[in-house]
From Swiss-Prot:
Belongs to the RuvC family. Residues 158-192 are annotated as: Disordered. Binds 2 Mg(2+) ion per subunit. It comes from the Bacteria. It is found in: Cytoplasm. Signal peptide: none annotated. The keyword DNA-binding applies. This is Crossover junction endodeoxyribonuclease RuvC. Its EC number is 3.1.21.10.
Amino acid sequence: MIVLGVDPGSLKTGYGVVQHHNGSFSVLAAGVIRLQAAWSHPERIGIICRELEQVIAEFQPERVALETAFLSHNVQAALKLGQVRGAVIGLVVRYALPIYEYAPREVKSAITGKGAATKEQVAFMVSRMLSLHTVPKPHDVTDALGIALCDILRGESRQSGVPPRTNSRRKSGTGGSWEQFVRQSPNVVVRS
């Protein structure tokens, strides 16, 4: 299975293409689309869509995972992020790909087991799960890879009938997708 994870932003949009095969993960592509603040917002959205379209055409993901919008006190920033998300969703729909959306807290919980994990903790676990020698920079890249990994883990839960783990305060050992991942991927999990 190949999943494209997208961490949308109006100045930086991270993307990561992750393949899951026989219980192991590999990165096919990852990067950040950097945009200039001086460019018009419609121009930036167009560039994001063109770049992501090239990624979709080259790697042909089976589905796309997108981070949901966060609550912002800056109305203009929230509107711009919503426009970027809408454009990405429109692009994905045009390719008839299924799209799944995940809140940042859900991604953190799926990757680290804690919904309140720091970006550094997420980046560390993403690099471990993907057997990377270094942590990808900037955080937009590791966030996008984490979103793709979250989708793969949640997809396994959907297929197996295990409910997704949405509340990070649940007691461990209750059968959430993180526990399932650990059981199914002994070669990926780092044990101390």
